A protein has these predicted regions:
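Solvent-exposed interaction patches of small proteins and small membrane subunits
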Residues: 1-102
Length: 102
């Protein structure tokens, strides 16, 4: 299977959009965030979106490299083992996968 650059470019655009939405709506303090449930929902939803997009990218890259992850977290672990992803980032993403499932 060949790497689909168009898919990756689209996913990276979606990731940028999710991060941008979080950045543009980020409150100046934790107190302001805690006081605004709509803002909390927007931030959480875009964090979930960003994590899911990263999972999609990692799964695509793993599959393109003949890896067969059984879970979302395994995709990051396998990419790190192949030297395609920093180990610390892989560990953080595995934790983020768990956050997404909360």
């Amino acid at each position: 299977m060949n790497l689909n650059r168009d898919v990756l470019i689209a996913k990276l655009g979606q990731l940028h959009d999710a991060i941008d939405r979080i950045e543009t709506k980020r409150p100046r303090s934790l107190e302001l965030l805690l006081a605004d449930r709509d803002l909390q929902d927007m931030v959480c939803k875009n964090i979930e979106r960003a994590v899911q997009i990263c999972i999609d990218i990692a799964t695509h890259l793993a599959t393109m490299n003949a890896l067969a992850p059984k879970t979302s977290g395994e995709s990051f672990k396998m990419l790190a083992a192949k030297g395609m992803l920093d180990t610390e980032l892989a560990t953080a993403m595995i934790r983020a996968v768990g956050f997404r499932n909360v």
